[in-house]
Amino acid sequence: MSESILSATLGYVELETGSIPADWVLSGNPQTRSKILGRSGDLLAHAILWECGAVSYKWHYNQDEAYIVLSGEGFMTDEKGVERRFGPGDVAFFPAGTNATWRHPDHFRKVAVLKESVWRPVGVGLKVWKKLFRVIGITDTSPLLLAVTTWTAWKLR
């Protein structure tokens, strides 16, 4: 099965207007612009282009987020009160559940990959399951094949 490959010239992506939740805004203009660039086949992750203007706000990461800054700068203060600067070329990762305070003096533009977190035993089980399929030589595991294999294994127990 062929999957679609993400390819975008970021300067030509039409962004949609959004905003930072009003009760999270500390100062400035909470308007944002973003566009989902692509989603994973399991719908647990997506890539997004996101930007904002001069603003300061609190942020709660309800998904894992990894990103690279394209332009502008942001100053993030973590829960321990430590401030870090992020500028063009910088890469960051914020696990789900992280809280931070952000300040953008002018503008900030990033490409981010957001991923839903799953309960650790489920994630480990999935990795073991996929490894088992690779070991026995099954590399293209369709949902139908997985369902039939699971049903068969259940009936044979």
What is the role of each PLM region?
Residues 88, 96-121:
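Ligand-binding loop in jelly-roll beta-barrel domains
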Residues 80-96:
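Short acidic-glycine-tyrosine-enriched beta hairpin
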